[in-house]
Amino acid sequence: RRFLMKGADKMAEFSNSNTVSVAAGENLPLTETAVKAPACIMHREGSGLVTLRGLTNQCKARFKVSFGGNIAIPTGGAVGPISVALAVGGESLTSATAIVTPAAVENYFNVFVAAFIEVPRGCCVTVALKNTSTQAVSIANSNLIVERVA
């Protein structure tokens, strides 16, 4: 069939291998492109935003966005719950939120979140990983994968 999508030509992988302190309410900057993005996925290196484009003949394009990484309270922070979430158009998705409660600062936890995001034909949607905590969070070895699934 002509409309059958094939593997890696419909996915992209963005990462930040450094440990980054992300302020409350801010997005994680993605500094490396491990797998080059197709035309329906756009990203500027160093930006925290990834743009999904509704380039499709159907009513909408569907993407699976997943994030994995390690999070901790940075030195000088207050011990308590910290959280990160996938954000669509700047709004955090409660269904794609990871919350951990470290016992001490610099105590890293591995987190993973994923969501399906639908983009209407001809439209664009931005996605990011957002610090939804009330304080700065250290994020290390982060990896955001975007797959065009339909």
Report the location of each language-model feature.
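Extracellular jelly-roll beta-sandwich "head" domains, especially the C-terminal globular C1q domain
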Residues: 2-150
